[in-house]
Amino acid sequence: MLKELKLLDGKTWDYNELLDEMLKDDFYYGYLGKAALSSSSLKKLLQSPKAYQSSLTESQTETKALREGKLIHLLLLEPHKEEILTVVPVKSRTAKAYKDAAAIDGPENTFTETEYMAAKRVAKAVKSCPEAWEMIYGAATEVPVAGNIMGLPFRAKADILH
């Protein structure tokens, strides 16, 4: 089994310590997003080296579908994180109240009531489907793993494992 992993920044990590840190979103998407490769970074590399470099230095545009998907994912697989969300009782993200809340709590954690309720309906529908809920209930979620592929450090998180 892997005992240590050397990352792209040259730092060597104890494997178990790295896995523990990977449970923290700020570490996983922040530091490790630049210090290790992932399937997402490989997609950017396949586009061009410039696209990869831009993904490291520039904020990425979040599509409506990705934003909705992240919220549904959180509600189903990480319900303990629901408490970090700010739900603003407006219909549009162009509303002043939404913009004010997003400036304080971050746009990634701020949703309109309309967005939130739509995601809650989808999550409820999934939970109401016995076949789907059986796959989710009691499973381990957001399970981190790291390792070397062809001598390069990679990171990943399994959404769900039974």
Kindly label every feature range from the protein language model.
Residues 1-157:
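Metal-dependent nuclease catalytic cores that hydrolyze phosphodiester bonds in DNA/RNA
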Residues 159-162:
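Active-site beta-strand-loop-beta-strand hairpin of nuclease catalytic cores
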